[in-house]
């Protein structure tokens, strides 16, 4: 299974019941197609770069899950059909850049930092 991130933007003026129904549908799609659900974060309401369907603001959600191509296709199909969703984007993150950063060796070790500062001062 591959790792995916999906960010979707909902209309900012939705009631909590409507928001809950959309997020529940998203989780149901992941579960029904045997995906592994990791997290769903509410990033809050933010100003959009440009108005989408006459909404200058949108409520952002971040979804992270593992699954196959069919899962992503079905999730995007359902988001596309829901009028409460303004935009969405799914990205394959199987090769995470965080791993590459973690493998890097620091230029100066923590113990060497005071010695380097003293040498530079002289």
From Swiss-Prot:
Family annotation (SUPFAM superfamilies): Ribosomal protein S6
Pfam family, one: Ribosomal_S6
GO biological process assignments: translation
Gene: rpsF
Stored Gene3D superfamilies: 3.30.70.60
InterPro entries membership: Ribosomal_bS6 (IPR000529), Ribosomal_bS6_sf (IPR035980), Ribosomal_S6_plastid/chlpt (IPR020814), Transl_elong_EF1B/ribsomal_bS6 (IPR014717)
Organism of derivation: Trichlorobacter lovleyi (strain ATCC BAA-1151 / DSM 17278 / SZ) (Geobacter lovleyi)
Protein task: Binds together with bS18 to 16S ribosomal RNA.
CDD domains named among the record's database cross-references: bS6 (cd00473)
Keyword rRNA-binding listed: yes
Tree of life domain: Bacteria
Family stated for the protein in its record: Belongs to the bacterial ribosomal protein bS6 family.
Entry keywords, A to Z: Ribonucleoprotein, Ribosomal protein, RNA-binding, rRNA-binding
Name under which the protein is recorded: Small ribosomal subunit protein bS6
GO cellular component: cytosolic small ribosomal subunit
